[in-house]
Swiss-Prot record:
Swiss-Prot/TrEMBL site (Positions MEP for the nucleophilic attack) positions: 163, 219
Species of provenance: Hahella chejuensis (strain KCTC 2396)
Catalytic EC class: transferase
Function, in words: Catalyzes the formation of 4-diphosphocytidyl-2-C-methyl-D-erythritol from CTP and 2-C-methyl-D-erythritol 4-phosphate (MEP).
HAMAP family: IspD
Signal peptide residue numbers: none
Enzyme Commission designation: 2.7.7.60
UniProt cross-references to InterPro entries, sorted A to Z: IspD, IspD/TarI, IspD/TarI_cytidylyltransf_bact, ISPD_synthase_CS, Nucleotide-diphossugar_trans
UniProt GO BP: isopentenyl diphosphate biosynthetic process, methylerythritol 4-phosphate pathway
Protein name stated in the entry: 2-C-methyl-D-erythritol 4-phosphate cytidylyltransferase
Pfam families: IspD
Site positions (Transition state stabilizer): 23, 30
Keywords, sorted A to Z: Isoprene biosynthesis, Nucleotidyltransferase, Transferase
Amino acid sequence: MFVDSMEEHKLWVIVPAAGVGSRMGGERPKQYLKLIDRSVLEHTLDRLLSAPGISQIYLPLHPQDKWWPEIADKYTGKVISVAGGEERSTSVLNALEKIESHAAIEDWVLVHDVARPCFRISDISNLMRLLWNTQPGGLLGVPVADTVKRTNEKGEVLATVSRANLWRAYTPQMFRFGALLSALRQGSEKGVHITDEASAIEAQGLKPVMVEGHSDNIKITHPQDLPLAEIFLRRIMQEEE
């Protein structure tokens, strides 16, 4: 069984949640907005903790986060909060450095967006299964289906971009502990623009593996995303029953 083979290298899980979600509007960050019966953050944490092989999560939070204490007790021993940074990459790096003294360089780190509660447990299991014996790791994504245009600064179309081998990058993303720690540290030192963990790994000349997931694993970014996420999440949870 695959889960049994995970004993050789430990899996560490990080959910960066220090963002303020300015595009959603309002005072409450998007991860604390209600989705069905609980917050977006709670759905994400609860679903991750129900996945095989995941028993603990590191959660980088904004220093002035006043909402986490309201729900922290239910995650005692399961979720460890750490100081988040202004950038996602800084938050993940802070968590890695918190873990560093306990981790081996060949351990795995799985990073997931807090605002993506609509993932499938089966997709995480598939990601782990396909990447477990690879270097340096990879990520979930879906092939680009829409026609893609390149424009100039005026919005005028310059060209139609071929969709061949183009993917939309999602999370979770999973990489070897040592490789990700080194990539984020060097990226920070060199001022590299890091949009996700895969981009940090790519900047090191390494080639992450893309694993196909589902397009309904959306990131809640704008107000109109919440009702759509509710539809997707209800359907996914029903499928998983």
